[in-house]
């Protein structure tokens, strides 16, 4: 069965599952599971796991498609370099799609971060801390997409802010997010 997602996205997803404790990367004796779950419990856990994996892969596929369209649209508008705002699974996908689309990801702005790197991209606490120039801002904030959109729009103008469709950020007739 073909999932339609790149191996890099699968690897990123597996790492995320391991870090969340959903998947263990070690050999475990087969009988050990009997101590944790009844057969009915194991069946329910399996069903929930399948549901979670299905919805997660759907998110990854939709996010990848949205990011590729968004970067293509940005490229047509002359945007060659962008800053992401909001550290999330969506930001991971945007970094991977940015490489695929030859769009430079200059930095990731995340007010809660204390620096470092995210998939090789510098993490900064504010737009003022971004050291390189950039053409546009991409909202990748899953917790407060509207807040990040409003902040970026006020600072750089609506025409320089890109938002993946799956975030559901829409504009009313006056140009405000609704």
Feature names for model-found ranges:
Residues 2-22, 28-178:
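Hydrophobic, well-ordered beta-alpha structural blocks that scaffold small-molecule cofactor pockets
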């Amino acid at each position: 069965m073909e999932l339609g997602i790149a191996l890099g996205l699968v690897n990123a997803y597996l790492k995320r599952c391991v870090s969340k404790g959903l998947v263990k990367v070690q050999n475990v004796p087969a009988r050990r599971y009997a101590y944790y779950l009844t057969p009915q419990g194991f069946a329910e856990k399996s069903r929930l796991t399948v549901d979670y994996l299905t919805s997660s892969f759907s998110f990854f596929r939709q996010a990848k498609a949205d990011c590729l369209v968004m970067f293509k649209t940005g490229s047509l508008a002359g945007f060659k370099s962008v800053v992401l705002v909001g550290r999330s699974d969506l930001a991971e996908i945007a970094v991977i799609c940015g490489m695929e689309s030859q769009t430079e990801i200059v930095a990731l702005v995340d007010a809660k971060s204390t620096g470092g790197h995210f998939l090789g991209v510098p993490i900064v606490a504010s737009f003022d801390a971004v050291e390189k120039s950039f053409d546009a801002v991409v909202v990748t904030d899953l917790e407060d997409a509207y807040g990040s959109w409003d902040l970026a729009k006020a600072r750089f103008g609506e025409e320089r802010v890109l938002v993946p469709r799956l975030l559901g950020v829409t504009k009313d007739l006056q140009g405000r997010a609704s």
